[in-house]
Amino acid sequence: MPTDADYLIDSQDPRHPANLICTLCKQFFDFNWCTGTGGGISIKHPQTGHLYVAPSGVQKEQMKPHDMFVVDGKSYEYLRIPPGLKPSACTPLFNACYKYKSAGAIVHTHSLNAVTCSLIFGQEFRIRGVEQIKAIPSDRKDPSTGKVLNLNWDDTCVIPIIENRPHEDQLEDPLMETFEKYPHACAVIVRRHGIFVWGPTIEKAKVINEALDYLMELAVKMHQLGIPPDCSVGQESKYISKH
């Protein structure tokens, strides 16, 4: 491994993965998604294919580019290891998303909405008939362009839920099983833990993550009212609890 690998993280471009991860970590901390050093982000460099990964144990609002780990996008070997820091325990999960989902970025948060939904729902989080669902990718493609189409507002958004493990790297096998069972999923909720979201670019992954957090927050409020989040549009009044 090169001893002078800082060139991999030195850039004045705010869109460079080493800089962008720091910006997003601060935003996610402010949203209460990544407090107490929890959560993580990884971004693939669009030109080099290198994988940039936020470290373990660093407060997200204080993250700096020199804290970044850099991984070879083909061999998955470390190209840069920041002195004194540990790699994220999520790294094997991020690598699996890159390898098997052709991800360009992965976001992992400890969102309260994701954790609460994992307590309410069983094996799947399901919600339908909400405008924000249109931000979530579907299993359909445009026949003329081949591009993945997003869900319609009245479609049902389904996000699988897996059980937590003592250590995050132990989630790799359940994650791989989820890839097989839900080949078009863009996220997985980990019960009592948080959520992993991936997309072809960091911009897409960020949008999906924000949309899902909105949908999960809404689902919790619907549950409090006695309304199943995946009930048919127009049927809500049948379920509203009488107080």
Curated annotation (Swiss-Prot):
In short, the EC number is 4.2.1.109
Keywords, sorted A to Z: Amino-acid biosynthesis, Cytoplasm, Lyase, Metal-binding, Methionine biosynthesis, Zinc
* Recorded metabolic or biological pathway in which this protein acts: Amino-acid biosynthesis; L-methionine biosynthesis via salvage pathway; L-methionine from S-methyl-5-thio-alpha-D-ribose 1-phosphate: step 2/6
Catalysed reaction(s) here are: 5-(methylsulfanyl)-D-ribulose 1-phosphate = 5-methylsulfanyl-2,3-dioxopentyl phosphate + H2O
Binding residue positions for Zn(2+) = 108, 110, 193
- Which GO cellular component terms are attached? cytoplasm
Q: What SUPFAM superfamilies does UniProt report for this protein, alphabetically?
A: AraD/HMP-PK domain-like
InterPro entries this protein is in? Aldolase_II/adducin_N, Aldolase_II/adducin_N_sf, MethylthioRu-1-P_deHdtase_MtnB, Salvage_MtnB_euk
Which cofactors?
Zn(2+)
Among the GO molecular function terms of this UniProt record, one is: zinc ion binding
Instruction: Tell me which domain of life the UniProt entry assigns to the organism this sequence originates from.
Output: Eukaryota
The record lists substrate as bound by 90
The top EC class is: lyase
Note accompanying the cofactor annotation: Binds 1 zinc ion per subunit.
Gene3D superfamilies associated with the record: Class II aldolase/adducin N-terminal domain
User: Active site: which residues?
Assistant: 131
| GO BP, sorted A to Z | L-methionine salvage from methylthioadenosine
Query: Would the keyword Cell membrane be found if you checked this record's keyword annotation?
Result: no
UniProt-annotated location(s)? Cytoplasm
Listed PANTHER family: METHYLTHIORIBULOSE-1-PHOSPHATE DEHYDRATASE (PTHR10640:SF7)
Q: Which NCBIfam families match?
A: salvage_mtnB
Family under the similarity heading: Belongs to the aldolase class II family. MtnB subfamily.
What's this protein's function?
Catalyzes the dehydration of methylthioribulose-1-phosphate (MTRu-1-P) into 2,3-diketo-5-methylthiopentyl-1-phosphate (DK-MTP-1-P).
Q: From the Swiss-Prot or TrEMBL record, give the protein name.
A: Methylthioribulose-1-phosphate dehydratase
UniProt source species: Zygosaccharomyces rouxii (strain ATCC 2623 / CBS 732 / NBRC 1130 / NCYC 568 / NRRL Y-229)
